[in-house]
Amino acid sequence: MDSIGLMVLDMDSFKNINDLYDRSFGDEVLRITAQKVASMLPPNAMLYRLDGDEFGILLLGGDAKEAAHIYGKLQKNFCKQQEYGGKKYFCTLSAGYAAYPGDGSNYLELLKSANYSLEYSKIMGKNRMTVFSRDILADRERRLELLELLRESVERGFAGFTIHYQPQVDTVSGRLCGAEALARWHCTKYGDVSPGEFIPLMEQSGLIIPFGQWILSRGMAQCLEWCRFRPDFQISVNLSYIQLAQGDFISFLRTALEEHSLAPSKIILELTETYLAKAEEDTLRMIAQMKELGVKIAMDDFGVGYSSLFSLKSIPVDVVKIDRGFVKGITSDLFNATFIRSITDLCHDVGSKTLVTQFYHYIFPHFTFL
C-alpha cells in the first residue's frame, strides 16, 4: 500500500446546538452527521468516531489531493442550513489531515499531527481543511510560547504593553473629536507582536477579561485627562465577545465609570459587525443595558462581514465604522466612493454617525458630507 492518510473532522460550534436545543437533539445531529459523511466517502475511506463531535476518516492509498477533494464535497454539503425534527441549525466542519509515514510513524503520531492541523483550521476561522506541515508545528510552538509570555505579562501588570491612540477627526469642522485606544505589545523574546496574533490567544485563554478591563480603565483615565482641554472628547475601546459572555461586565463597566468620575457618553464600545449580526437575545440585552448607562455602541468593520442592513435597524448602534478596505483608492474608485456615501446617508437618516477608518485629511475635500 502506497500511503495511509488520516483526516480528523470536528463539528464547528456543536456546543451551540446543545445549548440552543438540548443534548438529545445534539445526539441526533451527531448521528445524522455521521450518516451523511459516511455516504459521501469513496470505497477506500473508513469513517469512525474519535470523541464527542470529532470523527476520523482513514484514507487507504490516498493522498492530500484526494483528501482535499473529499473535504470539498463535505464542506459544500455542510455549509447549508440543516433541519431535523422541524428544528433548523448550521454546523460546518473543520478538518486536519496527516499522512503516514511522513507525518507520523505510528497511529498515535499520525493522530497527533492530524489534530495539530485541525487546531490550525479552527484558529484560521473554521470551516476549512489544513494539511499537516512542519510550518504548522513551528506555528503551534510559537503560539504556546507566546501564550506563556502573555500570562507572564499579565501577572507583571501588563508589562510590555502600551496603548496608542488613533485620532478621530470630524470631516466637516476638521477638529479632533476623539480617539481609539489600540493596544501594542513588545514581547521580550519576539519583539513587536501584532494584535492579530496576540488578541486571539488572549480570547482562547481567557486573558482577554483582565486585559480588556485594563485597556478600558486606562482609556477612561486618559479620556478624563483630555476632556480638561476638550470637553466633547470621546474614547473608543474595542470589546471582545468573550467579555460580553462574562455575566459581570455591566457591573464592571458601571464601577469603572464611577471610579473615574467619567460621563458614560464619553465612552464608545466597539463590537464587530460579524458578531453583532449573529447577536443573540442575551447579547442584545447587554447592549441595551450599556446604552441605558449612557455608553455609546459602535459597529466595527462594517462592510467586511455580513453587511446586513437589517442589523442597522435591529441593533441600536450609535456609530458605524466603515472598514478601511473601502478607503483605498477612494478618489478614483467609484464603487467605494458610492458605498461610503450611501451608508453615510443611511446612517444619518436613522440617527447614527459614521466613522471611516484611515480616512486621511487629504481626502476630506472630496467627502465633506460625513
Positions of predicted regions on the chain:
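Conserved long alpha-helical elements within nucleotide-processing catalytic cores of c-di-GMP signaling
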Residues: 1-5, 12-42, 48-52, 56-60, ...
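The catalytic core of metal-dependent phosphodiesterases that act on cyclic dinucleotides
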Residues: 15, 254-330, 342-370
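Catalytic core regions of nucleotide second-messenger enzymes
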Residues: 48-50, 78-94, 122, 191, ...
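Catalytic strand-loop-helix junctions within cyclic-nucleotide turnover domains
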Residues: 58-67, 85-88, 93-110, 135-138, ...
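Catalytic-core segments of nucleotide cyclases and related cyclic-nucleotide turnover enzymes
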Residues: 68, 72, 85, 100-126, ...
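C-di-GMP signaling machinery
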Residues: 101, 120-162, 172, 202-206, ...
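Catalytic core of bacterial c-di-GMP phosphodiesterases, primarily the EAL and HD-GYP domains
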Residues: 129, 171-180, 205-283, 358
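Active-site core of bacterial EAL-family cyclic-dinucleotide phosphodiesterase domains
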Residues: 142-201, 238, 299, 356
